[in-house]
A protein has these predicted regions:
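A generic structural micro-feature
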Residues: 139-143
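A non-catalytic structural micro-motif
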Residues: 77-86, 101-132, 145-152
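C-terminal motif of bacterial Sec signal peptides marking the signal peptidase cleavage site
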Residues: 14-17
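Periplasmic peptidoglycan-binding/tethering modules of Gram-negative envelope proteins
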Residues: 19-80
Length: 152
C-alpha cells in the first residue's frame, strides 16, 4: 500500500516538473533605471558636459545638458551631487588641477543660477588624473575635457 502511494506521489511530482507553464512574476517589472539614481541621470539627462581646449566657459551644448540637470535636481530634491572637473593630458599637473576646478565651478554656478541650492553641490578637480577616454589624440582629448556630475 505504501509503495502504491509513494509511486503515485512520485508520478505526480514528475508530471508537475514537466509542466510547460512559465513561472509568473508577482513583482513589478523594471523597465529602466531606478528613478532619481545615477543611472537615471545618465540615461535621461546626461551626466557630463564638455569644454574647449584650455577653456572653462560653458559651450551651448553644455548649457542644454546643465538645464536638464537643473530640472532633474529640482525634481529629485533629496539628491546631492558632486561635479568633477577634468582635463586632457596636455599641460602641467598644477595647471590642469586649477583648470579642472574652474570647469567644475562653472557647471556648479550654472546649476545654482537655475535654482539648485549650492549646499547640494560639491566640486572637485582631478585635472588629468582620471581620463574617461584613453589615447593621445584629439578625439580622446576632447572627451577628457569635461565636468561629470555624480549623485551622492
Amino acid at each position: 500500500m505504501n509503495i502504491k502511494i509513494l509511486g503515485t506521489v512520485a508520478a505526480v511530482a514528475l508530471l508537475a516538473a514537466c509542466s510547460n507553464q512559465a513561472a509568473t512574476s508577482t513583482g513589478p517589472v523594471s523597465s529602466g533605471p531606478v528613478p532619481g539614481s545615477q543611472e537615471d541621470l545618465v540615461a535621461n539627462v546626461g551626466d557630463r558636459v564638455f569644454f574647449d581646449l584650455n577653456k572653462n566657459a560653458l559651450r551651448s551644448d553644455a548649457r542644454i545638458t546643465l538645464e536638464r540637470q537643473a530640472a532633474w535636481l529640482q525634481k529629485w530634491s533629496a539628491n546631492n551631487v558632486q561635479i568633477a572637473g577634468n582635463c586632457d593630458e596636455r599641460g602641467t599637473q598644477a595647471y590642469n588641477i586649477a583648470l579642472g576646478q574652474r570647469r567644475a565651478n562653472a557647471a556648479r554656478d550654472f546649476l545654482v543660477a537655475k535654482g539648485v541650492a549650492a549646499t547640494r553641490i560639491t566640486t572637485i578637480s582631478y585635472g588629468k588624473d582620471r581620463p574617461t577616454a584613453l589615447g593621445s589624440n584629439e578625439l580622446a582629448w576632447a572627451q577628457n575635457r569635461n565636468a561629470i556630475t555624480s549623485v551622492r
